[in-house]
Amino acid sequence: VNQHVGGVVLRSDNNNFVGPENALPELQQLISDLQKTRYDTSSAANYLRTYNPLLIGISQTENLLPTDQILNGITALPSEMTIGATWNTGYAEEAGSILGEELNALGINLFFGPSLDVLDSIQTDAGEKLGVTTFGGDPYWVGKMGQAYIKGLHEGGQYKVAVVPSHFPGIGNSDRLPEQEIATVR
């Protein structure tokens, strides 16, 4: 409280979600408690209530480990590669809209995604997971699909969900997930 925390990132490996059967109600309660604490402490020393809500962030892309945090209770969405393979920005926007609506309903207001990596080569070894977390290998179409997905997130989330696309240029061609080890890009 005294550290003036501006936000939190919720992750299943931090035990922010316990058990599949109660994950969503527990998550909503956790977020509500965090925001209430923020509200109560924002005005404790002031006569005027100046409340800025906490940023509650999460990574949630396609209901698969290790990139997703909430694995039960929300709509199962296709991977970015599946969406990208359609060459239809309408599908990307629709998937983003569904996710934005569900994140907003839970109280999550910061989304880490989608991946805007450009996959330069097919990987069949340890790095293959990167292949489904990108819209494809053409920079133009990855940009178009990402733009539509983000538009859907904003509209579905009633413009209450901020979006931070990931990762860095070239990481779509790395040999391992950056969350596991330092990736090598060749």
What are these regions (language model features)?
Residues 104, 154-157:
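Anion (oxyanion) recognition and catalysis
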Residues 156-172:
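Aromatic-lined carbohydrate-recognition surfaces of secreted/lumenal glycan-active proteins
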Residues 2-142, 167-185:
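Enzymes and membrane/adaptor proteins characterized by extended Gly/Ser/Thr/Asp/Glu-rich
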